[in-house]
Curated annotation (Swiss-Prot):
Keywords: ATP-binding, Chaperone, Coiled coil, Mitochondrion, Nucleotide-binding, Stress response, Transit peptide. It comes from the Eukaryota. This is Heat shock protein SSC1, mitochondrial. It comes from Candida albicans (strain SC5314 / ATCC MYA-2876) (Yeast). It holds the Pfam family HSP70. The lineage of its organism: Eukaryota, Fungi, Dikarya, Ascomycota, Saccharomycotina. The keyword ATP-binding applies. The keyword Chaperone applies. GO terms for biological process: chaperone cofactor-dependent protein refolding; iron-sulfur cluster assembly; protein refolding. Required for the translocation of transit peptide-containing proteins from the inner membrane into the mitochondrial matrix in an ATP-dependent manner. Constitutes the ATP-driven core of the motor and binds the precursor preprotein. Gene3D superfamilies: 1.20.1270.10, 3.30.420.40, Actin, Chain A, domain 4 (3.90.640.10), Substrate Binding Domain Of DNAk, Chain A, domain 1 (2.60.34.10). The gene is SSC1.
């Protein structure tokens, strides 16, 4: 465990743009740099044509490609539209919405929920991650993402008649470190050099604001197939600065589909007495019909779902013939739409802005076309959202612009993105020492000096956390490592410099160095499980809800740490000069040390303690020790006449 050295200041600095690790270590782009929107439901690819981004059509003539991969009984692998076409007859081996699993552990609540909502198998890999199974083979979500990225790569190569090796790939703004690393890995799997992972709402803002010169504050509301993000950006004179970001990594069109599927299945069961829940082929037919109905209800007030021969019983074949109105659907998904409101308010608050400061609201993602969603956005921001960009294509176009920036084709554009959650380490008493606050512009590199919590300590464990609470037990552990080989020394003497380094992809490296020996250790936090939407929402909500009590608990622990140091120092001095002091005085001070230590141990264990009692006992010990040693040094000075300073 580490203890913070409060007398030493934090060292905070940011890399110059030209020297970010992502730029310096990535291979120089050869040939065109494409921009890929790797979406939950659909993906798209774009490239710069001169100063303008252009969406490239796939071999089927579509400007977007379904993010679906299927494995047929003949051993063929299908990607995109061909995979979607055969999903009804091959539901168990057709994998869709797999982006929701990327960078997640099998035990995550979202994964467990998805297991019951999809016709294919989600399995637990040996490392604890969520993987997929098709035709007896297991695949990581990164592999499936890689197959889709490869389809985008092939689309670009066919359109450009050139070999493509480099890409900028987008991800949700609220993706954590593991999910970002997994997105890069998906490209690596298919031999694609992912130069940068860029946040989806930021990419959309690039597409919207490339030609704008005047200063504007823009809110990007991005409700896609699987995730929801909102970002507030300041755009002007070629500078795109993200002020704040918020969102939910498990909220999107898939959830709207699931709600409608459940409604149809329940209605059919009520009418016929037949439960279709376990009939994978029937559920896949209903899912496709539900998605189609959802899209139609954005432009019509009602639609019909007709599915003949959905099943059969002793009385003969059964059919689904159900009319759904827009009002019914809106009522059905109202709880999902309401989940977008709070993140918007928090993003504005974090940016230090009010709705009147926002010049434009940009809608991104297929679900942002739903009239009720548009109405909700209007009520949040108090203005009509802009219809200046295509919600399905803006993200890929923005990624292409970022590719153009990296390739040197787009000049005078600077993109300043942020990290979505605070980062820090655990110090003595379980205190969260925050090194990088949420919404800090990236790339960022910050250092702070810490020390040992016990005498003779030769190693320290660095536990890295992500979250907004004052104590680590309330935040998310995302990695840990050990720095060994520290020379034995008194408690608090070694100087250990801990450095957090976030690159332009938002991927975190944490290092620790003993300044005396220059021994160091580090970790790139890439194997952590994904933060659930509930965890992220709870982190930010709890941080606000418990701000005062957290602050009080932190102050109590920090005060207890200082009191503990006083106990140690006083005890050491007693042992050194015990023979010169009366046994009665020594015993009195020792009793006070014991009483104070009992309170200190409770505080350091996170138990509730009275700050007044802690303060009182500390002052009593301090005063008693001062009087005791004052007399000692006074007597010593009179008897010896020495001018020697007392020992530390």
């Amino acid at each position: 465990m580490l203890s913070a050295r409060n007398s030493l200041k934090n060292i905070s600095r940011q890399f110059p743009k030209a020297l970010t690790r992502a730029q310096s270590t990535a291979a120089a782009p050869t040939g065109p740099v494409i921009g890929i929107d790797l979406g939950t439901t659909n993906s798209a690819v774009a490239v710069m044509e001169g100063k303008t981004p252009k969406i490239l059509e796939n071999s089927e003539g579509g400007r977007t490609t379904p993010s679906i991969v299927a494995f047929t009984k003949d051993g063929e692998r299908l990607v995109g539209i061909p995979a979607k076409r055969q999903a009804v007859v091959n539901p168990s081996d057709t994998l869709f919405a797999t982006k929701r699993l990327i960078g997640r552990r099998y035990e995550d609540p979202e994964v467990q929920r998805d297991i019951n909502q999809v016709p294919y198998k989600i399995v637990k890999h040996g490392n604890g991650d969520a993987w997929l199974e098709a035709r007896g083979e297991q695949y990581s979500p990164q592999q499936i993402g890689g197959f889709i990225l490869n389809k985008m790569k092939e689309t670009a190569e066919a359109a450009l008649s050139k070999k493509v090796n480099s890409a900028v790939v987008t991800c949700p703004a609220y993706f954590n470190d593991a999910q970002r690393q997994a997105t890069k890995d998906a490209g690596k799997i298919v031999g694609l050099n992912v130069l940068r992972v860029i946040n989806e709402p930021t990419a959309a803002a690039l597409a919207y604001g490339l030609e704008k010169k005047d200063g504007e504050v823009v809110a990007v509301f991005d409700l896609g197939g699987g995730t929801f993000d909102v970002s507030i950006l300041d755009i002007g004179a070629g500078v795109f600065e993200v002020k704040s970001t918020n969102g939910d990594t498990h909220l999107g069109g898939e959830d709207f589909d699931i709600a409608l599927v459940r409604y149809i299945v329940d209605a059919f069961k009520k009418e016929s007495g037949i439960d279709l829940e376990k009939d994978k082929m029937a559920i896949q037919r209903i899912r496709e019909a539900a998605e189609k109905a959802k899209i139609e209800l954005s432009s019509t007030v009602s639609t019909e779902i007709n599915l003949p021969f959905i099943t059969a019983d002793a009385s003969g074949p059964k059919h689904i013939n159900q009319k759904i109105s827009r009002a019914q659907f809106e009522q059905l998904v109202e709880p999902l739409i309401k989940k977008t409101i709070e993140p918007c308010k928090k993003a504005l608050k974090d940016a230090g802005l009010s709705t009147s400061d926002v010049s434009e609201v940009i809608l991104v993602g297929g679900m942002s076309r739903m009239p009720k969603v548009v109405e909700t956005v209007k009520s949040i921001f108090g203005k009509e959202p802009s219809k200046g960009i295509n919600p399905d294509e803006a993200v890929a176009m923005g990624a292409a612009i970022q590719g153009g920036i990296l390739a040197g084709e787009v000049k005078d554009v600077v993109l300043l993105d942020v990290t979505p959650l605070s980062l820090g380490i655990e110090t003595m008493g379980g205190v969260f020492a925050r090194l990088i606050s949420r919404n800090t512009t990236i790339p960022a590199k910050k250092s702070q000096i810490f020390s040992t919590a016990a005498a003779g300590q030769t190693s320290v464990e660095i536990r890295v956390f992500q979250g907004e609470r004052e104590l680590t037990r309330d935040n998310k552990l995302i990695g840990n490592f050990t720095l060994s080989g520290i020379p034995p020394a008194p408690k608090g003497v070694p100087q250990i410099e801990v450095t957090f380094d976030i690159d332009t992809d938002g991927i975190i490296k944490v290092s620790a160095r003993d300044k005396a020996t220059n021994k160091d250790a580090s970790i790139t936090v890439a194997g952590s499980s994904g933060l659930s939407d509930a965890e992220i929402e709870k982190m930010v909500n709890d941080a606000e809800k418990f701000a005062e009590s957290d602050k009080a608990r932190r102050e109590a622990i920090e005060f207890a740490n200082r009191a503990d140091q006083l106990c140690n120092d006083t005890e050491n001095s007693l042992n050194e000069h015990k023979e010169k002091l009366s046994s009665e005085s020594v015993q009195k001070v020792q009793d006070q040390i014991q009483q104070l230590r009992e309170i200190v141990l409770k505080a350091q264990a996170g138990e509730e303690v009275s700050p007044e009692e802690l303060k009182q006992k500390t002052e009593e010990l301090q005063n008693e020790a001062i009087n005791l040693f004052k007399d000692l040094y006074k007597d010593g000075g009179e008897s010896s006449g020495s001018s020697e300073q007392p020992k530390n």
